[in-house]
C-alpha cells in the first residue's frame, strides 16, 4: 500500500522533476519521526480536503504553485533589497481579500511544513520542548493557527486538563484549521489578538510566523507578553530575508529578531536558527539566504 508521503513525492516527481530532486536530496524518508508526523498530519489534511470535494492533488498543486511564486519573489527581492509590500492594507487587498490567491497560498503552506527542511527543523524544535512547558490545568493560546500543525502537536503532548484556544483574523485560515482539527476540543476565536482584554492570561502562547505579516511587530510582541501569566512561556518564530507575497516586515538577520524580542520585554530561553540553503554563514549573509528563527521566551 502506497503511503501518503510516497504518493506526494511521486506526484511532485511527475509534475516537477527538478523540485522532486531537490526534495530527495534534502529529506530523509528513513527518519521515523519525520515520517510518522508527516503521515499523521497529511492524513488529517486529506480527510479535510476530500470533504470539500477535492483530492490531495489539489493541495500538492497549490504547493508547487507556491514554490514557483516564491522563485519570482526571491528574484525581485535580490534586485530591490526589499519585500514587495510594506503595508497591511496592500497585502489585505491583494491577498487576504482575494479568495483564489489566499486559498492556494494557505494550502501550499500546509505541505511546506514538512517539505522545506528549515520549516520541519523548526517544528521538531517545538515538538522536543513543548511537552515540558505545558502545565497541568494551564491555558494554551495559538495566534494565527493556519495549518494547525503546532496546536495539534501541543495537544498530543498535553495532559487532559489543559485548555486550548486558537485565534485568527482570517475566515479562510480558520476554516482550514477547523477542518484539520475536526473532532478535537479547541476554542476557535475569529478575532484580532489586540481585542483580547489585558486581564485575560495564558500560561503558554504560540505565535508561529506572524510578526513578519504586520507593520509593527514590536506592538504585537508586547501584546503577547501582556497576555502571558507571570512566569509564562511563549514560542515565537519568524523568518529573515524570506520574500513571499504576504510578508511585510523585513528582518535582515537573526540578531535583529533577538533584539526585538528583548526590546519587547522577553528573555530568550532556547532558540534555533536554520537557513533555507545548506551553505556557509558567510554565503548565507552575502546572498541573503532565507533564515528561520524560532525561540521559547519568558517574561
Predicted regions and their residues:
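Class I SAM-dependent transferase core
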Residues: 92-119
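N-terminal auxiliary segments of SAM/dcSAM-dependent transferases
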Residues: 5, 9-95
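Short catalytic/ligand-binding loop motif for oxyanion handling, primarily in non-cytosolic enzymes
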Residues: 113-115, 150-151, 173, 243-246
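Conserved alpha-helix/loop element of class I SAM-dependent methyltransferases that forms part
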Residues: 104, 117-136
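Conserved SAM-binding loop
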Residues: 125-131, 138-239
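S-adenosyl-L-methionine-dependent methyltransferase catalytic module, highlighting the catalytic core
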Residues: 180, 215-226, 233-296
